[in-house]
From Swiss-Prot:
One of its GO terms (molecular function) is oxidoreductase activity. Coiled coil: none annotated. This is Lactate utilization protein A. Belongs to the LutA/YkgE family. The gene is lutA. One of its GO terms (cellular component) is cytosol. Is involved in L-lactate degradation and allows cells to grow with lactate as the sole carbon source. InterPro entries: Cys_rich_dom, LutA. It comes from Shouchella clausii (strain KSM-K16). One of its GO terms (biological process) is lactate metabolic process.
């Protein structure tokens, strides 16, 4: 099965290991992974800031870049959700709206793809940790995906998963929200970290690098030792 990886900006710049683990997990489950080198940002920062014409430029580039892909897989619910938003951008342009719909029909967040398309029942990972999982907003609200990550984490040998209170609440990142509303964002992430600490977990897992960067930064600033990992890293773990 041919899969094209949309690595995302944050994974590419700050978490390259997430991209590597994503590729290895997909390959382990029979995928031939391609990486289009001319891929760029999905356009979400511009979209969230109201620059819709600039977003359209990024969207057209992405649509053309992945036009021949069988499947497009992203290690990010947020960026995957943005690709699904493209068709709304081109509601007044039938040609590009159709092309956007074609891209959306083959776009999946990583855990979605593993569960919904590949039907993985044994992820083949080992992680002897007590962990808790942060559910990101865009993945749960826009992609409407809440089950796939837990389905896969339950297959990880040695992993003890502790429930997180108020798991549906935002961590305060929200892309440009954390820049525009820093005081509110700080209060939100502080509350999130408090709930994480209350689980007694020594590992926080999430599916979006933006959330993990925000929460991980607060954990470090608070002097705590909770490890923070993207779910791709856990699904590729052997320890």
């Amino acid at each position: 099965m041919n899969v094209s990886l949309f690595v995302t900006c944050l994974a590419d710049i700050f978490y390259p290991g997430v991209g590597k683990d994503t590729v290895e997990v997909l390959e382990r489950h029979g995928c031939n992974v391609k990486f289009p080198e001319n891929q760029i940002c999905c356009g979400q920062p511009a979209f969230n800031s109201g620059y819709h014409e600039d977003t359209k430029k990024a969207a057209k580039h992405t649509i053309e870049t992945f036009a021949d892909a069988d499947y497009v897989v992203l290690p990010s619910g947020s960026c995957a959700a943005m690709l699904l938003e493209y068709k709304e951008l081109f509601a007044d342009d039938p040609e590009w709206e159709k092309r956007a719909e074609e891209l959306a029909s083959k776009t999946y967040e990583l855990t979605q793809f593993l569960v919904r398309v590949l039907k993985v029942e044994d992820i083949g990972a080992v992680c002897h940790k007590k962990a808790t999982y942060h559910t990101s907003c865009h993945m749960s609200r826009l992609l409407r995906e809440t089950e796939a990550p837990f389905s896969l984490l339950e297959q990880v040998k040695g992993l003890e998963l502790a429930p997180l209170a108020n798991k549906e609440s935002c961590c305060g990142f929200g892309g440009t929200f954390s820049v525009k509303m820093p005081a509110i964002s700080e209060q939100m992430v502080e509350e999130k970290v408090g709930h994480i600490e209350a689980t007694g977990a020594d590992l926080l897992i999430g599916a979006d690098c933006g959330c993990l960067m925000n929460i991980g930064g607060r954990i470090e600033r608070n002097g705590k030792t909770i490890e923070v990992k993207h779910i791709a890293q856990v699904l590729n773990s052997k320890e």
